A protein has these predicted regions:
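Short alpha-helical segments enriched in small residues
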Residues: 2-164
Length: 164
């Protein structure tokens, strides 16, 4: 499985923010249902929107463990164990931060088999070259070693003109 099988490429290239979150939530719901797995979110730039969106799906409590909204760097470090070195070297808007967010989420959420991290920059005061730049990581707990995870990260450029 790859992240592209969960998040279609066309969505990553052209999606507006609400469409991206809605589609991501539907894909994650379908995956959790088919795998009979539970999942959790670690959200930064989405500020809990993924949790709120997935919470609208009837019966989702069977699969959804919860979400950690970690908007600030220090909160990412304290709640998800994202290293200060990663945040200083690569910033919060990086594949490295997304990877560590997923690992920290799965480490701290024992009943989740799947972790999804969303981090990025969505303005409103973002410079044009980074506005809409988002990294989404999806991690899967290794069945043979519950302290080991497989993580895929996708860089996404969202259509910033229609976030709401």
């Amino acid at each position: 499985m790859t992240i592209e099988s969960i998040i279609p490429a066309h969505l990553c290239e052209t999606a507006a923010w609400p469409d991206f979150i809605s589609s991501l939530c539907e894909e994650i719901r379908a995956l959790a249902e088919s795998e009979q797995s539970r999942f959790a979110f670690a959200e930064s730039c989405s500020s809990g929107l993924a949790a709120a969106s997935i919470g609208e799906i009837a019966g989702i409590s069977q699969y959804f463990c919860g979400s950690k909204v970690t908007y600030r760097d220090n909160t990412k470090h304290e709640w998800l164990a994202v290293t200060r070195d990663t945040l200083n070297r690569f910033t919060a808007v990086s594949e490295f931060t997304a990877d560590e967010m997923v690992a920290g989420l799965l480490t701290s959420t024992s009943e989740a088999d799947i972790g999804i991290a969303i981090t990025g920059h969505l303005g409103p005061d973002a410079p044009a070259e980074i506005d809409g730049h988002v990294f989404t990581a999806i991690g899967f707990r290794d069945e043979s070693n519950t302290d080991s995870f497989r993580v895929w990260t996708q860089e996404i450029r969202l259509n910033c003109k229609s976030r709401r």
